[in-house]
């Protein structure tokens, strides 16, 4: 089967971008090592994950995937706005 131009472009772009994402997740995971980092003093971690999970669920939806995310038993939709506000405060220029 011969792929059209859009299909070829997708196969050229999507896998490497997902590999980059996987790499970035691995780097973030390294920050969880308790021998090198301390994060228990801040709510930064849950707020950042809430924002990222929301972005990932919206991205997945664009590909036709329906993903439900809960954090501590709470639906991400219920806690996203507060988390985004804190995320933006930390990332303000």
Predicted regions and their residues:
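N-terminal intrinsically disordered, cationic/polar leader segments
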Residues: 1-34, 38, 46-93
């Amino acid at each position: 089967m011969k792929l059209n131009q859009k299909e070829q472009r997708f196969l050229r772009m999507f896998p490497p971008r997902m590999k980059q994402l996987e790499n970035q997740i691995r780097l973030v995971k390294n920050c969880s090592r308790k021998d090198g980092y301390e994060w228990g003093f801040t709510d930064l971690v849950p707020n950042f994950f809430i924002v990222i999970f929301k972005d990932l669920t919206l991205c997945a939806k664009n590909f036709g995937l329906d993903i439900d995310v809960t954090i501590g038993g709470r639906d991400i939709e219920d806690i996203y706005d507060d988390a985004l506000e804190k995320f933006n405060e930390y990332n303000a220029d």
